[in-house]
Amino acid sequence: MKKLTLQEKQNTADTLLKRINALHEPGETVRLMEVCGTHTVSIFREGLRQLLPSGIELVSGPGCPVCVTDQTYMDKALAYAEREDTIIATFGDMLKVPGSYSSLSEAQAKGAHIHVIYTPLEVIELSKKYPEKKIVFLAIGFETTIAVICATVKAVHEAGLKNVFFLVSHKLVPPALRTLLDRQEGHIDGFILPGHVSVIIGEEPYGFLPEEYGIPSCIAGFDGLEILSAIANILEQRKTGNIVVGNTYHSVVMQKGNPVAQAMMQEVYDICDDAWRGIGIIPNSGLALKDEYAAYDAERALPIELDKPSLDPKGCQCGRVLQGLIKPSECPLFGKSCTADHPVGACMVSVEGSCAAWYKYGYSSGGSTWED
């Protein structure tokens, strides 16, 4: 794709905004949910809210993998971290996610063996470097990450490694969107669909949105122009009544996605119900290792029982934020007891979390309150 000059970008933005204003009915409120944490950050960074008509409201959804990871999962991870014979391998943004009583960063400060890795395949190096230890990898993430972790599971299996285990809590995006619509707690007029996830799954898994719910949607890239283009696409669907799964990210996202990655996921995992933070159990929204790979499933190979109940942080409204029911600034803890330096909830921990984005980018010009 040709790289646009600054002037060309400005001209394109002007054209898109004129189109959006023409498609939006004055006085009408349209609530669009961006389902990807990267979109949330881009919307703030590029100041898109300030450019759109006042009636177009952008709300954040359950698009941050760290944020939607259930509290019980974190408590299990911490329980494994307490074992002397165990090394936890994890992505760095999991360190500060609060469990019921502690966090991985706090456990690490007390002597727990926790290694931050940048690619799942690093667990193989850890396995060989520490053959006397059990390596437990925190396998979280949406479809984008799942494909890479599948390759790691297969590599561990083929290498015959006996000390690598996966604590799995993968999440699938389409079932979560269905649950949000079924609950009908918050009015959603359209979805800005995630780009990276859609590279893997394609357009077809979102087909239920127009077919069953009559909800317009559009797959979007990640810069401001691509997001504006998706918003214009959704508004045009509403205007014409031709409700479809739009795709303004054609250069990357194919209709059927990545069949190789999909086949690998089907080979390694079975679909299962899974718990989402603040939302609860969503049917068919998770993955579990197939029986063929049960020896690498931490919960089956290294069973653990929690001796205390899992508790959400008192007062934290992360679950309501993830469902688009409230803005982060409407949580009573936001900017007070819950800040980027001292996060109470998972939505403030991850760089893709809605609360973290609001906190970083959402200051008003006065610097003391957050813009709504």
Language-model segments: residues:
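Short hydrophobic/aromatic-enriched beta-strand-loop microsegments
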Residues: 57-60, 114, 159-166, 188-191, ...
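Hydrophobic alpha-helical scaffolding
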Residues: 6, 67, 138, 142, ...
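A conserved active-site cap/scaffold subdomain adjacent to cofactor or substrate pockets
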Residues: 185-254
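Metallocofactor- and cofactor-centric catalytic cores in central/energy metabolism, strongly enriched
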Residues: 1-132, 146, 156-158, 167, ...
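A generic structural motif
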Residues: 58-64, 164-171, 218-225, 248-251
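Internal helical hairpin/lid segments
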Residues: 229-320
